[in-house]
Swiss-Prot record:
Gene3D superfamilies named in the record: 3.30.300.30, N-terminal domain of ligase-like (3.40.50.12780)
Protein name: Propionate--CoA ligase
The keyword ATP-binding belongs to this UniProt entry's keyword annotation: yes
Family from the record: Belongs to the ATP-dependent AMP-binding enzyme family.
GO molecular function terms noted in the UniProt entry: ATP binding; propionate-CoA ligase activity
Alphabetized UniProt keyword annotations: ATP-binding, Ligase, Nucleotide-binding
Pfam families: ACAS_N, AMP-binding, AMP-binding_C
Stated role: Catalyzes the synthesis of propionyl-CoA from propionate and CoA. Also converts acetate to acetyl-CoA but with a lower specific activity.
Encoding gene per record: prpE
Pathway in which the depicted protein is active: Organic acid metabolism; propanoate degradation
NCBIfam families: PRK00174.1, PRK10524.1, propion_prpE
Naturally occurring in which organism (per UniProt): Escherichia coli (strain K12)
EC number: 6.2.1.17
PROSITE patterns xref list: AMP_BINDING
Length: 628
């Protein structure tokens, strides 16, 4: 079957199509209804079927390949490497599942995971899946304020963390950040389970904090039966940035997620059991959830958990891993590759990369120079793909397992099966023609594996994603165009979310952080193009006192203070690249901030129609501030 036929069947006969794909995983109880779309836009997949992500990732491989590699944990920071076969991983996951139960974690309870990229983090997520607990991973780069907001939203009974992580030789004190977060949160977890790596001192709260290693010793050899979950029960909550400043908890199911990932590993990524998949992301992001934690194991592949930078201790660290473990498929973000471009290609080419068949890049638009450099340096195909936290797996790609069409530089490919993608005119809602810019939307129902709803807020789910046009379609909030051959090109965000090195950040979140500085009267944050990171945040601040406008030393001092504040409240990846001080900001006469206009000026583009602006002189201030 050609990819075109495969795709059309998924759109025209979705129930039959996905019922066939569901055979890729084990079901303890068969589903009675493939799709329930009786309450749109909500979609329920594989109704009344019972399955389990942990069983499909580990247990079902115990008979076929118990001694095959399953998990490879590498830290270039501590120079530690650990490997687990499927049998060994099964033992460890059972022990941690027993530990969780001993701490009172039950089916449906939330477990918040705030950990570095170590084996225990991955094992904890699989243990949650085993017993039917809902895991919610918070990216290790988030500061206490952001962690506290997620604690209050998810209300976990247990938090699993560590003393510290490391990045580029710098210690990140997870426990200290977590203690600060818990002190700020209204919700209080019953227990905090802590992995002590010996990297940083940590204070322990009596009666609440539990040592991971000591408890594990008590549960070695335990066997915990799989909790067979109805397909539409919740597997995880993963927070993504929103324009309101309050992060959205993307809620995902069990059966649909497993089927979507298993199908994607075969058809999109061409993964084969017994081979090794290296996704150089973080489990705190959706790419890590899907293609570090679950998808490779669902396909019987080994997966790599990597702690460190692509350049630490040197620019060959990734390629040493590829060579040593015979990695066949690799997944990263363009930003990481742009960093590597600064180093001599000889440092990469000195490694034996003959096992590597393809490199996948996602998280931000892939530019032509980066794609060409990778392809020439590694001598492998480079496959872009486009998706979101909400989708859980690629919306667009080239399905290497089915499709032999060539890649097209600058394009993430064509719509994937299950996604009825349209480009709509933002004003009329009418479909766009070839090479006409429009908003990229998906007709409902969304395919398996996608967002079920926003955790605890169905109304926000409908209002945010399904209410932009006169008819209900899922809005991606990305601009796109389609060429005559069906290739799509992503042109950027339509909302106030920016993409910094593959990390989505709400400009409102950064603005709220900056606004909390006592010297700030008003602020506007926009994302601007950056050669290395794709986008960076920049801030324009109206200070309460005029000395920041008149004295460069004062302005520099205030800029440093504001950056430090954002670091502490959001994390250093949210830090603005620049903070400029102005006496007024461009707004419409109704008071709406003209962020797109500010962004255009920052990027040297035509700001467009300015008929609604209240005071054109405010634009001159933006220009002058940038020139100083």
């Amino acid at each position: 079957m050609s990819f075109s036929e495969f795709y059309q069947r998924s759109i025209n006969e979705p129930e039959q199509f996905w019922a066939e794909q569901a055979r890729r995983i084990d079901w303890q109880t068969p589903f009675t209804q493939t799709l329930d779309h009786s309450n749109p836009p909500f979609a329920r997949w594989f109704c009344e079927g019972r399955t389990n992500l942990c069983h499909n990732a580990i247990d079902r491989w115990l008979e076929k390949q118990p001694e095959a590699l399953a998990l490879i944990a590498v830290s270039s920071e501590t120079e530690e490497e650990r490997t687990f076969t499927f049998r060994q991983l099964h033992d460890e996951v059972n022990a941690v599942a027993s530990m969780l139960r001993s701490l009172g974690v039950q089916r449906g309870d939330r477990v918040l995971v705030y950990m570095p990229m170590i084996a225990e983090a991955h094992i904890t997520l699989l243990a949650c899946a085993r017993i039917g607990a809902i895991h919610s991973v918070v990216f290790g780069g988030f500061a206490s304020h952001s962690v506290a907001a997620r604690i209050d939203d998810a209300k976990p009974v247990l938090i699993v963390s560590a003393d510290a992580g490391a990045r580029g030789g710098k210690i990140i004190p997870y426990k200290k950040l977590l203690d600060d977060a818990i002190s700020q949160a209204q919700h209080q977890p019953r227990h905090v389970l802590l992995v002590d790596r010996g990297l940083a001192k940590m204070a322990r709260v009596s009666g609440r904090d539990v040592d991971f290693a000591s408890l594990r010793h008590q549960h070695i050899g335990a066997r915990v039966p799989v909790a067979w979950l109805e397909s539409n029960e919740t597997s995880c909550i993963l927070y993504t940035s929103g324009t309101t400043g309050k992060p959205k908890g993307v809620q995902r199911d069990v059966g649909g997620y497993a089927v979507a990932l298993a199908t994607s590993m075969d058809t999109i990524f061409g993964g084969k059991a017994g081979s090794v998949f290296f996704c150089a992301s973080d489990i705190g992001w959706v790419v890590g959830h899907s293609y570090i934690v679950y998808a490779p194991l669902l396909a019987g592949m080994a997966t790599i958990v990597y702690e460190g930078l692509p350049t630490w201790p040197d620019c060959g660290v990734w390629w040493t891993i590829v060579e040593k473990y015979q990695v066949s498929r690799m997944f990263s973000a363009p930003t990481a590759i742009r960093v590597l471009k600064k180093f001599p290609t000889a440092e990469i080419r000195k490694h034996d990369l003959s096992s590597l068949e393809v490199l996948y890049l996602a998280g931000e638009p892939l530019d032509e120079p980066t794609a060409s450099w990778v392809s020439n340096t590694l001598d492998v195909p480079v496959i872009d793909n486009y998706w979101q936290t909400e989708s859980g797996w690629p919306i667009m790609a080239i399905a290497r397992g089915l499709d032999d069409r060539p890649t097209r530089l600058g394009s993430p490919g064509v719509p994937m099966y299950g996604y009825n993608v349209q480009l709509l005119n933002e004003v009329t809602g009418e479909p766009c023609g070839v090479n006409e810019k429009g908003m990229l939307v998906v007709e409902g129902p969304l395919p398996p594996g996608c967002i079920q709803t926003i955790w605890g807020d169905d109304g926000r789910f409908v209002k945010t994603y399904w209410s932009l046009f006169s008819r209900p379609v899922y809005a991606t909030f990305d601009w796109g165009i389609r060429d005559a051959d069906g290739y799509h090109f992503i042109l950027g965000r339509t909302d106030d979310v920016i993409n910094v090195a593959g990390h989505r950040l709400g400009t409102r979140e950064i603005e709220e952080s900056i606004s909390s500085h006592p010297g700030v009267a008003e602020v506007a944050v926009v994302g601007v193009k950056d050669a290395l990171k794709g986008q960076v945040a920049v801030a324009f601040v109206i200070p309460k006192e005029s000395d920041s406008l008149e004295d460069r030393d004062v302005a520099h001092s205030q800029e440093k203070a504001i950056m430090a504040l954002v670091d502490s409240q959001i994390g250093n990846f949210g830090r603005p690249a620049h903070v400029w001080f102005v006496s007024q900001l461009p707004k419409t006469r109704s008071g709406k901030m003209l962020r797109r206009t500010i962004q255009a000026i920052c990027e040297g583009r035509d700001p467009g129609d300015l008929t609604t602006i209240d005071d054109p002189a405010s634009l001159d201030q933006i220009r002058q501030a940038m020139e100083e």
